[in-house]
Amino acid sequence: MNLEQIYKDCGAYLEGHFLLSSGKHSQFYLQSAKVLEDPKLAAKLCNELAKIIASYKIEFDSICSPALGGILAGYELARACSKRFIFTERVNKEMTLRRGFEVKKGEKFIICEDIITTGGSALESAKIIESLGGIVVGFAALANRGFCAVENLKSPRKDNAKLPENLPLFTLGNFEFEIYDETNCPLCKKGSKAIKPGSRGN
């Protein structure tokens, strides 16, 4: 499966000057919503991801995703795995579990995102699950931006990665994009301003 080509064909592989959710800047952005707007394609991708997870014989009960970006990928993965799905969301900038969702003591979860950059949002969701008595057994995403180690791709962990080293991450592919702090961003130095994806229709 050529994940990069799928993103390009869907108009989801964007080039510009972007402010990522991690606070970093990048010349490229993956707009997964454009990929997941096609139910058949979303199902195809998440079915493939489910097969990868199953091949590692990871036992889990439910899937949790951080809103907003992870919801579609997480729901489709849960459907492919025949598992329960819940999501966390930010309230006053703090990740929380709402809407009557519950976590049973000892319930095993995979945390699913659309894209993993440093893994910060996924880690926040994992901490919520664990604080309520759940057990996080792994992470999953359609794609990894190259910072976190991916179990099935045998890709190495880099300094910016926030996901725990003792838990596996499964993805369909890696995108190796440079990301920058605002202070050393070459795009900023050229005078352009970083745009938060979605703020101007992108």
From Swiss-Prot:
Binding site residues for orotate: T117, R145
One example of a Gene Ontology biological process annotation: pyrimidine nucleobase biosynthetic process
UniProt xrefs under PROSITE patterns: PUR_PYR_PR_TRANSFER (PS00103)
Keyword DNA-binding (UniProt): no
Job description of the protein: Catalyzes the transfer of a ribosyl phosphate group from 5-phosphoribose 1-diphosphate to orotate, leading to the formation of orotidine monophosphate (OMP).
Family in the record: Belongs to the purine/pyrimidine phosphoribosyltransferase family. PyrE subfamily.
UniProt name for this protein: Orotate phosphoribosyltransferase
